[in-house]
């Protein structure tokens, strides 16, 4: 019964949408306990491309790469995969039909984020190749701090209120 309690619902009304219709939809989701916010559709697509679509695509890809390497490593990739690989690749167990459709329908934003990710990955490759420990340390320190801020925001748990005990569903409007 609490499937939507404390969860985000992002409305993406196109320009010209009847404000009363948006208000009714907002009320509907609020009544289900969702945290409702509005976003421009193109902005929504970019945000979801980086925080949802890209992680799924990368997980599918790394599982495929590991499987391809099985013959080279004599079946030791899967054999020795531990919790890090398991946790990271959990997303690859998602519905392939849904992710095919997501990729086809949000391809521009996904391709933009893949391009950015590829640039960042190339930066990481160069730092490793050149033995640039300072760049590696700076990158890992910065991104660890970002990950910790995600935990502090309560976004790292499946709990209905993201682990914020006693948190109430709130109506959040864009720009607040």
Predicted feature descriptions by range:
Residues 3-90:
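Internal alpha-helical scaffold of NAD(P)-dependent oxidoreductase catalytic cores
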Residues 156, 164-176:
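A conserved regulatory-domain signal marking ACT and ACT-like small-molecule sensing domains
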Residues 57-60, 94, 123, 149:
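Amphipathic alpha-helical interaction surfaces
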Residues 74-143:
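Interdomain hinge/lid region at the active-site interface
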Residues 139-149, 163-165:
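A short, charged, Gly/Pro-tolerant segment at domain boundaries
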Residues 149-157:
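Amphipathic alpha-helical coiled-coil segments
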